[in-house]
Amino acid sequence: MPTPPCPCGRSESYEKCCGRFHGGTAAAPTAEALMRSRYCAFVQGDASYLLRTWHPRTRPARLDLDPGMRWTGLEILDTADGSAFHTTGTVTFRASYRGGSLHERSRFERVDGAWVYADGEFLD
């Protein structure tokens, strides 16, 4: 039986995709990869990963995820910078959930060489 694809939308299995980042065996190499892994963490309810990958300057003291929230898909709409050669980047995306969607432009920065989520701007 084929392995289901990662919730982030890539065709790889969770273990070969975002699971490596969640488990700490690899770091997201780009801002988009971090965005996808953070979406996947929301799907899985992994608040500790979300906090770990949040910029220390903007990170909340705690994060309470709604256990009833059902995320249903991620669409990357645009990326700017955020590669291995950049220190900042943005990812514009639409994340769908049961009953609606979230449209955001997220800003990412490198801290000690690792990509972290800095903040985001809700769109429409």
From Swiss-Prot:
Q: Which InterPro entries match?
A: NTF2-like_dom_sf, UPF0225, YchJ-like_M
Q: SUPFAM superfamilies from the xrefs?
A: NTF2-like
Family in the record: Belongs to the UPF0225 family.
Q: What is this protein called?
A: UPF0225 protein SCO1677
Q: What is the lineage of its organism?
A: Bacteria, Bacillati, Actinomycetota, Actinomycetes, Kitasatosporales
